[in-house]
């Protein structure tokens, strides 16, 4: 184990890592990312399990853990979970949310890959990580019921391309989740329909996608997300050959991009994509 002085110096260095990395360019930046990742992992190993339980180290974990190294992320959330009471005494509910979010992402990635191992992560909701999931708190549905319903539906959609089964399962999910839902939940459901089944969606599926995306749009304030939902709705209307409605939503999306502040790059990319959709629409209308 490294001595404490050395670890204090490393902590200061790791806290400054994000702003330091922003200043690097090209090959240098890549080299530093690799070096900092190595330093970070050694630092975590030297202080695990209990010496990491403080605000500064939690900030370091949030900044540098990332999602690239799944094995290390699994180690990290298990480390937190094994000492969750201590973590929560120091930092409130945040570490529980971190565990839940990471486990949900693991389950989602597996389900979308059509890998039945997603079920292992769903089972952790009611056993290994039960306490963390309790903290998140739901009304009218248990965290396990929620996870099972959602990830079973997702797996079925991506693995079996069973759109009808997915729509039915998600309507049940939305019904049971009613008081816990966020706009993004509807948006993601619509997006998964496009991502998994895209070209094979029937007219009735596009109608469902429009309904979900409109619900998401009605409750969403973030400009990028609003633009995304408007374009999705426009795409569905285009597939339904309702070109007037498609144009209306594409134009709305374009107008929305004008409100993006200090974001020239994403603004230009979005506008060019929407213009392309509008010109494609003109060809279809001829």
Where are these regions (language model features)?
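Terminal, low-structured helical/coil segments at or just beyond the last alpha-helical repeat
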Residues: 248, 252-286
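Boundary/linker segments of alpha-helical solenoid repeat arrays
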Residues: 178-185, 221-226, 256-271
């Amino acid at each position: 184990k490294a001595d404490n002085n050395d670890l204090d110096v490393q902590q200061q260095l790791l806290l400054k890592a994000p702003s330091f990395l922003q200043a690097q360019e090209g090959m240098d930046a890549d080299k530093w990312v690799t070096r900092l990742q190595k330093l970070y992992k050694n630092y975590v190993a030297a202080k695990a399990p209990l010496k990491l339980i403080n605000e500064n180290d939690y900030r370091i974990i949030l900044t540098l853990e990332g999602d690239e190294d799944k094995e290390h992320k699994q180690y990290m959330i298990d480390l937190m979970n094994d000492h969750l009471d201590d973590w929560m005494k120091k930092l409130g509910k945040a570490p529980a949310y971190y565990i839940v979010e990471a486990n949900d992402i693991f389950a989602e990635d597996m389900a979308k890959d059509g890998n039945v191992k997603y079920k292992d992560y769903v089972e952790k909701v009611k056993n290994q990580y039960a306490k963390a999931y309790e903290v998140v708190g739901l009304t009218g549905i248990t965290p396990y019921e929620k996870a099972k319903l959602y990830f079973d539906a997702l797996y079925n959609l991506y693995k079996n391309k069973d759109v009808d089964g997915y729509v039915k399962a998600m309507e049940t999910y939305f019904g049971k989740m009613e008081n816990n839902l966020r706009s993004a939940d509807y948006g993601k459901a619509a997006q998964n329909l496009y991502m998994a089944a895209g070209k094979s969606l029937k007219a009735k599926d596009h109608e469902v996608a429009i309904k979900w995306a409109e619900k998401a749009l009605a409750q969403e304030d973030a400009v990028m997300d609003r633009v995304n939902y408007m374009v999705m709705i426009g795409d569905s209307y285009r597939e339904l050959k309702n070109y007037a409605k498609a144009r209306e939503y594409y134009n709305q999306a374009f107008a929305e991009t004008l409100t993006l502040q200090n974001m020239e790059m994403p603004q230009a990319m979005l506008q060019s994509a929407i213009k392309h959709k509008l010109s494609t629409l003109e060809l279809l209308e001829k």
